[in-house]
């Protein structure tokens, strides 16, 4: 697969040959969905907590005598049916993380990249550098390229000026190649890869 390379100014800078083993697969929604669910499960805090009947600070004395009241039998005021009682089967602090094999994660990333390439939502930049860290100038460059909702992936090191200028632009994320992931690829309309990012991806999956 061959794609043209553009600069931030919108000029053509040649073309790049993309590996079909990474960008030319037929996307499978089931594999992508498994990886997205794995990511969302892993990042969930799991700090929810409700007190059970054993954790309620209340007297343990029997409420009233067993017989002769005409009412139902009760032994504790901490039970869930009373106001202020403990929660029955309430949430507890736990990890929501699930397991997903590394090979499936790698395959899901390839399918997400292939999906963007197939839909025509993959853009290749020569580099992601900016002389002056000016957000207004960067917005102008992105408008010229038609990028209003995009994820930009650079090489191992982000250019400080570019990253600082992009920080305040809504619907735009900038990540180094180490941070590339299926969820962020799918949540943005366009995927922008620099030539350094493509080289790193091909080296990773070689």
Swiss-Prot record:
Gene Ontology annotations for the cellular component aspect, listed alphabetically: ribonucleoprotein complex; ribosome
Signal peptide span: none
GO biological process: translation
Gene3D superfamilies the UniProt entry points to: 3.40.1370.10
InterPro entries, A to Z: Ribosomal_uL4, Ribosomal_uL4-like, Ribosomal_uL4_dom_sf
Keywords, ordered alphabetically: Ribonucleoprotein, Ribosomal protein, RNA-binding, rRNA-binding
GO molecular-function terms, A-Z: rRNA binding; structural constituent of ribosome
Membrane-crossing residue ranges in chain numbering: none
Family of this protein: Belongs to the universal ribosomal protein uL4 family.
Cross-referenced HAMAP family: Ribosomal_uL4_B
Subunit structure and binding partners: Part of the 50S ribosomal subunit.
PANTHER family according to UniProt: 50S RIBOSOMAL PROTEIN L4, LARGE RIBOSOMAL SUBUNIT PROTEIN UL4M
Protein's name according to its UniProt entry: Large ribosomal subunit protein uL4
Provenance organism: Bradyrhizobium sp. (strain ORS 278)
Designated gene of the protein: rplD
